[in-house]
Amino acid sequence: MNKALFVYITLAGLALGVFAIWPELDLAGARYFYHAGGFFGRNDFERFGRDFFRVTPFVVLVAYAALWLAKRLGAKPRWAPSGRAMIFLIATMVIGPGLIVNLGFKDHWHRPRPIQTQDFNGPNPFVPWYDNNGGCRKNCSFVSGEASTGFWMVAPASVLPPPWRAPAMVAAFAFGFGASLLRLAFGGHYLSDVLLGGLITLIVVEIVRRVIWPKGGRENVKGYDFDRLRKKTPLT
């Protein structure tokens, strides 16, 4: 197990434990964004922010696919992802945000969203993350799809060449935190929802990475192993 995967699994376990023992932390976090009888997200600018965080990961995936295709058709972009990298990006998006989060948890874990609970003028009583008997029937609070998709941005950042990778990784984590914060502010999710949504995707990213690059290398279409690029040693 690599260090990143160990850290993500450990953080997920800690989050599950902390919010199981002290579920009131979720309510306290939601109350921070609840003012004048409602949450944020009621004006056009705030709704634009939600759409931005929701759409951008898919735009990035399409852009990477376009670069990959352009390279295959004879164009010469400065950089393009390898076929292996495209499999990595598609697989992590489908498995993490797609199958596990949206088709798995959100449609089968019946936790009401903050905006749907009685503590915030909704119809349903609050339930902690581990209680699957809440009043929500579908597209529920646990876990956050937007947080999951937001932290997926770590995947495309991680396959960039070394000069771009570090700042892109910082931007990717900032994007994930921004998407999560917005969902909290809108009353769409509790803190445990966004933490676990993001961590599930990060765990999936690391597992799929180990499957596709079992020796830990990352390739680009020019045939270089990025982990050895400083030595200018082409793969044979």
Per-segment meaning from a language model:
Residues 15-20, 94-99, 174-184:
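Aromatic-anchored segments of alpha-helical transmembrane domains
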Residues 10, 14, 57, 61, ...:
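Hydrophobic, lipid-facing residues on alpha-helical transmembrane segments of integral membrane proteins
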Residues 2-12, 126-236:
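Membrane-embedded catalytic cores of phosphoryl/pyrophosphoryl-handling enzymes
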Residues 67-108, 169:
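Interfacial segments of alpha-helical transmembrane regions
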Residues 1-67, 104-114, 118, 122-125, ...:
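N-terminal transmembrane-helix/juxtamembrane module of multi-pass inner/ER membrane proteins
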Residues 35-43, 64-80, 216-223:
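Membrane interface segments of multi-pass transport proteins and intramembrane proteases
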Residues 21-22, 65-78, 158-164, 207-212:
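Structural signal for the C-terminal ends of transmembrane alpha-helices
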Residues 1, 39-40, 78-82, 128, ...:
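Helix-boundary and loop/linker segments of multi-pass membrane transporters
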